[in-house]
Amino acid sequence: MTNFWILMLIAITISLASQFFIKKKYGIDKSGWRYKHVSNTHKWIEITLLILFVFSLSFFPVEYLLLLFFIVIDSIRIFMEWHYRPEDKQYMYHIVEVSLMFMLLIYVCTL
């Protein structure tokens, strides 16, 4: 369990560093810490997934569920941002995050 949180911290650090690099390379303007949903439907999909995540915490291990939650949420964000706001290129941030979380999930599942 402790290894998981250490790996999660490393993944977050790598994600932040890669976001900084992507922001510089592609000139992406990411303003603020709060995420802005593409549409009202997108917002409600994420709220529904968050509610499902909270209810399923008692049935599944937190490590797997947390990683799956981030993978699903970021995958939805990739699609919505790519489909509705491709000129912003913000979906590139989420591609990096999904890749890191997927690698972390594979590592945790093999333990």
From Swiss-Prot:
What InterPro entries does the database record attribute to this sequence?
DUF4181
Transmembrane residues, as ranges?
A: 4-22, 49-71, 91-108
What are the entry keywords? Cell membrane, Membrane, Transmembrane, Transmembrane helix
* Major localization listed first in the record, in broad terms: membrane
- Gene Ontology cellular component terms for the protein in this record: plasma membrane
Tell me the compartments it is located in. Answer: Cell membrane
The stretch of residues making up the signal peptide is: none
The way this protein sits in the membrane is described as: Multi-pass membrane protein
Q: List the disulfide bonds.
A: none
Q: What name appears for this protein in its UniProt entry? A: Uncharacterized protein YwrE
- Organism lineage string: Bacteria, Bacillati, Bacillota, Bacilli, Bacillales
Q: Which gene encodes it?
A: ywrE
